Amino acid sequence: MLRLSALCAVMAQLGCRAPCLEMAFTPFDRVFTRMGAEDMLVEGRSTFLVELQDAARALDHATRRSLVILDELGRGTSTHDGVAIAGGVLRYLHRNTRCLCLFATHYPSLCLPELGSGHMALDAEADEDDRVPTFLLRPGRAPRGSCGIALARRAGLPAQVLRRAAQISSANE
């Protein structure tokens, strides 16, 4: 969804037809993205460092008319530090830059009502035999739990592993 959103924004600004049924957007002065994982080990830069440098570039140069897309910021460190860094970046973008921002995270504490949260939900209409699950963007914070164990089942993990994963997941909710 994030990559497609970035692609549609750039294509529309170039005057190209975007691959969607419906779209409304404001022209952006810049588009900043941080998606995927990339390191530059030859330069001595880990995936986490590159991720932080990309985020810093967006914070330094984004304006109110920019689009910033960040996917799982903070995933390359401990949960404690990751949520702190992601929360700080999100707060800065919301309060200082005030740009349009698509911010994907697994940190539920960052999903605040004033930020217009949405979540990716597994399509209930999808066929159980589908190899690739279909997701839909839904408004609001994601419900407790995730589709992780269901996807692990589809991937063929052993029943013993799935049972233990369900127990651990339940205990951590």
Residue ranges and their predicted role:
Residues 1-173:
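ATPase nucleotide-binding head domains, primarily ABC-like/P-loop NTPase cores
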